[in-house]
């Protein structure tokens, strides 16, 4: 259920390993309608929980294995898409997490220290001369384990590959409810030995699933095509992705056609986990993103913003991604990527396929397998918590911008989210 990255990768890996299987993917809209088709295009090794949090919960070996699997997933996406003939503008140029205040420098140093402690991530502290030339830049943390992609090209390419491998894709088929061996849809009942919930941010729209995941909106803008020489002069080289260490997340990439695609959090959570098309565009947030982009790179002020959009991503109560398979009911689920879903969904789909086929792979032993996140609180507590967290993140950035010091609020946010 769900023709996004998770559902399609699961189907593809099932059919690549067992071509005689009958696999169907059900989708209310079209393949890639959700976050998979409209995200920031970061194929990164980022994972919702930090190495430190993973180690505290699951142990050192498990944390290191999870990090290695995430890093490997970045390269595997490039390799598998090439094998499948999918042109998704995959360019592995790494990501720069810019340092733009003393408070951000403190977090950057902590991130480098954690990477050195767990000895998996190959993070590098760069000087301001060697990174994208953003205002107030004090340098950056460079992570080579990141590629930029065109998300819509990737997800539509996966849909085509899934069908070529023998899968059945049912678009315009709304899932209303599901249970062991059965899925009730707008087109009738589908029956299967295994039922996979790959709905991610849209899970709350299904009967009985409203508290399992919280739909958090992230909005984006894109510029008109910009001369490559202008972007080169800004240090925004082909395929590069960038962010900074603020609390209210922003992210960007130089696209293959020389636009800057730029997004961030800040859009409000809607009472009752509501998801509506009108929430995809919020003028105030899009205007804020435009100001932030041009504040970081004033040269870009001379170029038009031609695209504005957004969408919902899935957040679990403990901010942890998971892959689950109940061997008795044969109900499976994957999600909770908290915006880090391009690579994580690939790893989840690969893992789900192994679990369903009973293959004892290294992925099937990763710590996110059969992790159970608690339910979100009932309303209005869920609304208060989600709105409060967003306000707190923005307030923390304001305090740090004024004082130059890391705020106590930001420490609480990172503790609550496992960062």
Model-derived regions, located:
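Flavin (FAD/FMN) cofactor-binding and adjacent substrate-gating region
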Residues: 49-56, 79-157
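Helical element adjacent to the flavin cofactor pocket in flavoenzyme catalytic cores
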Residues: 106, 113-118, 140-194, 198
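A non-catalytic, amphipathic alpha-helix used as a structural packing/dimerization or gating element
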Residues: 61-79, 110, 284-292, 351
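Active-site substrate-recognition segment that forms the wall
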Residues: 39, 83-91, 175-177, 189-229, ...
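Glycine-rich active-site loop/strand segments that organize a redox cofactor
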Residues: 38-69
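C-terminal lid/capping helical subdomain adjacent to the catalytic/cofactor pocket in oxidative enzymes
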Residues: 13, 17, 327-332, 338-419
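Beta1/beta-strand and adjacent pyrophosphate-binding region of the FAD-binding site
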Residues: 1-6, 24
């Amino acid at each position: 259920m769900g023709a996004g990255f998770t559902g399609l990768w699961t189907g593809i890996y099932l059919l690549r390993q067992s071509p005689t299987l009958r696999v169907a993917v059900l989708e209310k809209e079209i393949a890639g309608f959700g976050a998979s088709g409209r995200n920031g295009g970061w194929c990164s090794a980022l994972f919702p929980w930090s190495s430190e949090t993973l180690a505290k919960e699951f142990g050192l070996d498990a944390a290191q294995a999870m990090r290695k699997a995430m890093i490997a997933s970045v390269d595997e996406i490039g390799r598998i898409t090439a094998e499948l003939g999918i042109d998704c503008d995959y360019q592995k140029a790494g990501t720069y997490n810019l340092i733009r205040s003393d408070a951000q420098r403190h977090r950057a140093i902590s991130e480098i220290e954690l990477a050195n402690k767990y000895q998996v991530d190959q993070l590098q502290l760069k000087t301001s001369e060697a990174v994208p030339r953003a205002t107030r830049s004090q340098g950056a943390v460079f992570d080579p384990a990141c590629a930029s992609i065109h998300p819509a090209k990737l997800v539509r390419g996966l849909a085509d590959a899934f069908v070529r491998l023998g899968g059945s894709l049912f678009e315009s088929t709304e899932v209303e409810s599901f249970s062991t061996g059965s899925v009730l849809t707008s087109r009738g009942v589908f029956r299967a030995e295994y039922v996979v919930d790959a709905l991610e941010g849209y899970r709350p729209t299904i009967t009985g699933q409203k508290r399992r995941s919280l739909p958090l909106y992230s909005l984006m803008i894109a510029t008109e095509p910009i001369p490559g020489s202008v972007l080169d002069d800004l240090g925004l080289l082909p395929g590069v992705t960038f962010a900074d260490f603020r609390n209210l997340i922003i992210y960007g990439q130089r696209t293959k056609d020389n636009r800057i695609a730029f997004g961030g959090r800040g859009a409000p959570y809607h009472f009752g986990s509501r998801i509506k098309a009108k929430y995809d565009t919020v003028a105030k947030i899009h205007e804020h993103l435009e100001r932030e982009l041009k504040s970081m790179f004033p040269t870009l002020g001379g170029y038009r913003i031609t695209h504005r959009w957004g969408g919902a991503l899935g957040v679990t109560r403990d901010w942890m991604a998971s892959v689950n398979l109940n061997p008795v009911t044969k109900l499976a689920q994957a999600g909770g990527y908290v915006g880090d879903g391009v690579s994580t969904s690939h790893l989840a789909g690969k893992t789900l396929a192994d679990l369903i086929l009973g293959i004892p792979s290294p992925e099937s032993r990763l710590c996110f397998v059969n992790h159970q996140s608690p339910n979100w609180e009932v309303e209005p507590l869920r609304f208060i918590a989600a709105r409060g967290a967003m306000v707190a993140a923005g307030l923390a950035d304001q305090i740090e911008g004024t004082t130059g010091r890391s705020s106590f609020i930001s420490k609480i946010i990172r503790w609550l989210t496992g960062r």
